Curated annotation (Swiss-Prot):
The keyword rRNA-binding does not apply. The keyword DNA-binding does not apply. This is Probable transaldolase. Pfam families: TAL_FSA (PF00923). The gene is tal. InterPro entries: Aldolase_TIM (IPR013785), TAL/FSA (IPR001585), Transaldolase_3B (IPR022999), Transaldolase_3B/F6P_aldolase (IPR004731), Transaldolase_AS (IPR018225), TSA/FSA_arc/bac (IPR033919). Keywords: Cytoplasm, Pentose shunt, Schiff base, Transferase. Belongs to the transaldolase family. Type 3B subfamily. GO terms for molecular function: aldehyde-lyase activity; transaldolase activity. Pathway: Carbohydrate degradation; pentose phosphate pathway; D-glyceraldehyde 3-phosphate and beta-D-fructose 6-phosphate from D-ribose 5-phosphate and D-xylulose 5-phosphate (non-oxidative stage): step 2/3. Transaldolase is important for the balance of metabolites in the pentose-phosphate pathway. It catalyses: D-sedoheptulose 7-phosphate + D-glyceraldehyde 3-phosphate = D-erythrose 4-phosphate + beta-D-fructose 6-phosphate. Its EC number is 2.2.1.2.
Length: 212
């Protein structure tokens, strides 16, 4: 499974990139608004730093508007992936992008049939939201399993991005259940390498070394 970072903060992206694990970035309108920066300029910064897929989301709700925005975003850099919401208008836009060779990430996916629709429309990635499903008492990880099985059975060439990651266990379980990618907030990325027994082991090694 590959690691993406879910942020529009350039400093967080730099720090994660320095770890040597970062394969891509996902952004959304809320994350960009939080930064208070020009959207296109920030995308230029990110795409110059990260060579993998960088998801940039359209804000139009109609297919025509999505296609117009998406083409403008895709023109910023060759590694831009146009992020499109899972709606009927979004599916129309994804189909149009697919015909033009523009990569897409269908977001806000909460059911397996939505993921199947995205795949058939020609999406490159599909993003089921784990945490938000957990919030309403559903099992987001079960959704990953369902989508992975459907894609396998029907031999669909599309990658699953586990999104709305809340904690390290989400990452582990998503990998076990067939997600190709996890897009992770910087706070959770910072927790992935930590374990109390690792800290305890280092402390003991140093103690033994200093007492030799």
């Amino acid at each position: 499974m590959k690691f993406f970072i879910d942020t529009a903060n350039i400093n967080e992206i730099r720090e994660a990139n320095d770890l040597g694990i970062l394969a891509g970035v996902t952004t959304n309108p809320s994350l960009v608004a939080k930064e208070g920066v020009d959207f296109h300029e920030r995308l230029r910064e990110i795409t110059s730093l990260v060579k993998g897929s960088v998801s940039a989301e359209v804000v139009a709700l109609d297919a025509e508007g999505m296609i117009k925005e998406g083409k403008e975003l895709a023109a910023i850099a060759p590694n831009i992936t146009v992020k499109v919401p899972m709606t009927t208008e979004g599916l129309k836009a994804v189909h149009a992008f697919h015909q033009e060779g523009i990569t897409t990430n269908v977001t806000l996916v909460f059911s397996a049939v939505q993921a199947l629709l995205a795949a058939r429309a020609g999406a490159t990635y599909v993003s089921p939201f784990l945490g938000r499903l957990d919030d309403i008492g559903h099992d987001g990880l079960d959704l990953i399993s369902q989508i992975a099985e459907i894609f396998h059975v029907h031999d669909l060439d599309i990658q699953i991005i586990a999104a709305s990651i809340r904690h390290p266990q989400h990452v582990t379980e998503a990998a076990l259940r067939g997600a190709h990618i996890a897009t992770i907030p910087f706070k959770v990325i910072s927790q992935l390498s930590k374990h109390p027994l690792t800290d305890k082991g280092i402390e003991q090694f140093l103690k033994d070394w200093n007492n030799r």
